[in-house]
Curated annotation (Swiss-Prot):
Chain residue ranges for the region called ATP-binding: 2-314
Name of the featured protein: Rifampicin phosphotransferase
Region (Rifampicin-binding): 327-752
Region annotation Swivel phosphohistidine: where it falls in the sequence: 765-863
Amino acid sequence: MSGRLVVDLQDVDAAGLAEVGGKGAHLGELSRIDGVRVPSGFCVTTHAFRRIMAEAPESGELLDRLSRVDEGDQEAVRSLAARLRQVVGATPLPDEVAAAVTGALARHGERSAYAVRSSATAEDLPTASFAGQQDTYLNVVGTEEILRHVSRCWASLFTERAVTYRGRQGVDHRTVHMGVVVQRMVVPRASGILFTADPVTGDRRTATVDAGFGLGEALVSGLVDPDVLTVRHGEVVARTIAAKRRALHAVQGGGTRETPIEERRQREPVLTDDQAVELVALGRRIEAHFGSPQDIEWCLDDDGFHIVQSRPITTLFPVPERDDDVFRVYLSVGHQQMMTDAMKPLGLSMWRLTALAPMYEAGGRLFVDATARLAVPGSRATLLDVVGRGDPLTRDALETVLENGEFEPTPAETDGGAPPAGDGAEPDEADPSIVTELIERSRRSLAELEREIGTKSGPALFAFLREAFEEHKRVVGDPLNIRAIMAGMEATWWLNDRLEEWLGEKNAADTLTLSAPDNVTSEMGLELLDVADVVRTHPEVVAFLEGVEDDGFLDELPKVPGGAEARDAFEAYLDRYGMRCVGEIDITXPPVRERPSALVPVVLDHVRAFGPGAAARRFEDGRRRALAKEREVLERLRDLPDGERRADAARRMIRQVRAFAGYREYPKYAIVSRSFVYRQALLREADELVRAGVLADREDVHYLTFDEFEEAVRVRRVDERLVRRRKDAFRSYQALTPPRVLTSEGVALSGAYRRDDVPEGALAGLAVSAGTVEGRARVVLDMAEADLEAGDILVTRFTDPSWSPLFVGIAGLVTEVGGLMTHGAVIAREYGLAAVVGVERATRLIRDGQRIRVHGTEGYIELLS
């Protein structure tokens, strides 16, 4: 195939992407499906495009410059793209290319009308459609016109929209080439688009048909409103008939013309129900062939339906793979862990290997199957209650699934499920000494892991790790560990419910848990204030840190007066917290021990914003406030009827919540501490593969599963194509927003607030830390780029424990993801910040620098400017 300038569509299949581009490869593959009619034609190959680019003056230099330009510099992008279009469009077609196209036209009918369609190699891919980025020309007649439009298609690879889109997708412009499809025109009476899955809800069982009169380009370009038909299980279940006032038609001799539609026909259905069902059946055949939901362009003439394009619907959130047809309901793990970014394959596989429950993978995220718990009334009520307290949006999404009738619960039966957490009963008291015991057990287990793993390498390391994962699960799943976590949560729920009922006091536990002991995440933030105390006593150290640009600064720091003491303070901090990082549930994310420069701006901010001893003062202030709140609450309770009994119950629960609330953060710390040890050992193996020439980059192992990594170490070989595919898939997954709830049929649900107490124009969320604060919003998407001042309100997508040092100086917190007991909420309460989480699209609806008011008790945000 190498070097061909023209190839007939019938000789192309999906493997021809590099030769004919995405559209051409898909059309060739479509033409091979039984019962699918694709207009005949040929492709001008990417070899012809390369010939043009080789002969086009300046093209190489312009492409190099375009690939280096910052995608945010739109003026530079616009200028370079325009120059490339001009250069390519002005380059004459080589004689061999013109002869090849002319010969193909002679075979297919040189007097016929054709569609001339761009087909880039970065187009209609499984992970990115690139739809509409290059040009298509309809009803082109005559050899000279077709040659001219082939040249125009080549130039359209460099339209500003195409260049911008590729830049955002991380595609190097120098690696993309253009094929051109030249295809016999179908002159249709109707045309449109078929989505074999609902593009809004994601439901794979529901197909949507958009249909209009005449050529489909009018519909694709938004010139006309289409009829919309919804087809499910072989029948039309909904239809909207639009007023179709205009249509696009082919003109005799070439070109197209927009024409008005007679008034009497404007409300006529474009398709009958039978035709819509027939079209969807055709779409299902195409979907089955390609193995994923498709966005299909179709047209209808007297001979029936013709398919002129099919591409993956890349905006749908993927569905976990399964081996049965049972309707299933999945809950997002990332929303519970406050990390909704896509994870790499190594991180996904290791989380699954160490998880207590089966995990299911989709879109680079993890989900748990909640079907069994929803099936039985008792466990269903408990799940909805517990989930609802932590994250009302997830509860609403689950209730939507139940209300839609998709899920068929089992009849009422005794299932041994616990009563809902809010049933009013006082929780059993737990022995506070178990916290000390659990922490000591965890430390001993970690020390043993560190001692033993150092002696392992090669295949023996992976065998050892599999045993370590079992110990990992034993530590995390220890019933005593679960009891300690639940003791704090149950006491929190009881106090909040009863004190609001008895005293009208909302979220009283927020204050009662201030400066609770054993909260390793709040200690992480406060201890960085202690590092700042060391740094501030040495002006030369401060000056040195202000110039830090890389992660090697700790080696240079002792050369500065006072630097040795400062280095020791940093090292002590890293010894305890260096395993933490943004997105720490993914073992491939670099911990702060490997990126210590991330601490420098936070330490310098603390030096400027706080005086010496701030950590101890803040902790003691929190403890005093908690004790004062306890005295106040108990005194008010004693004044009520049956007050002594109520006060005694509250005292017991306050004692319990203070004993156990801090421990809520420890299990995650223990998990990440173990994962850091795993990571160090695995990276040593990756480095060995690099030294052996098996890998080009140690981080390529991030795109292998644990099993694949083990195999690579054993056989000393890695499939580079697999790694490239995984990198492409990861980039596409990063662009997807994961739902809180996902069904096995692809319905993605994020939930909604059902409230009438939110002022008009305010943003609703979940109240997780009491108080009201007004200040400047700082919208931060990357912790490393945070520029916060005292009194600012942090607005971000999510926070995990690694963000804790930033909480020390801010006044409030707003996140898009989170729940009552997730880490950001716990630490916001610990630091006394007004906080609202679960605010949908907060980082887009709140402007950086905008003044806002956070109502942490009521759960909403007012936009003030």
